[in-house]
UniProtKB/Swiss-Prot annotation:
Top-level lineage group: Bacteria
Source species of the chain: Bifidobacterium animalis subsp. lactis (strain AD011)
GO biological process: translation
SUPFAM superfamilies: Translational machinery components (SSF53137)
Recorded family membership: Belongs to the universal ribosomal protein uS11 family.
Function as written in the Swiss-Prot or TrEMBL entry: Located on the platform of the 30S subunit, it bridges several disparate RNA helices of the 16S rRNA. Forms part of the Shine-Dalgarno cleft in the 70S ribosome.
Phylogenetic placement of the source organism: Bacteria, Bacillati, Actinomycetota, Actinomycetes, Bifidobacteriales
Gene coding for it: rpsK
Protein name in UniProt: Small ribosomal subunit protein uS11
């Protein structure tokens, strides 16, 4: 009985298609940096973040963690055949430039770099200023 149940749960493995050109979306916040590498249509090929590569707490927000995450995402993307990426950077965090440099050093060719940080036209009230 148990053997039949296990055989019924087999899932189909996705076939890997070669994607020569992709997009790298870097979301850099004050607490973490998330890198997603997608194909031109926007389907995610690989991703990594500061927490994904083993950093916890305030260490996730460091430029070093962003670099390690970018390297990890680039390695996974290169297994899918990605060779060149157009970079889209969003957010005010400290890991922006380091992540782009790490993508280049991992072996990906960076085509263009675009800042897509959303700008509020007098939207919500910003958080109060810190008193340290």
């Amino acid at each position: 009985m148990a053997a039949q149940k296990q055989a019924a749960r087999k899932t189909r493995r996705r076939d890997r298609k070669s994607i020569p050109v992709g997009q790298a979306h870097i979301k850099s916040t004050f607490n973490n940096t998330i890198i997603s590498i997608t194909d031109p249509s926007g389907a995610v090929v690989s991703w990594a973040s500061g927490g994904d590569v083993g950093f916890k707490g305030s260490r996730k927000s460091t430029p070093y963690a962003a670099g390690m995450a970018a390297e990890s995402a680039a390695r996974k993307a290169m297994e899918h055949g990605v060779k060149k990426v157009d970079v889209f950077v969003k957010g005010p965090g400290s890991g922006r430039e380091t992540a782009i440099r790490s993508l280049q050093s991992a072996g990906l060719e960076v085509g263009s770099i675009t800042d897509v940080t959303p700008q509020a036209f007098n939207g919500v009230r910003p958080p109060k200023r810190r008193r340290v």
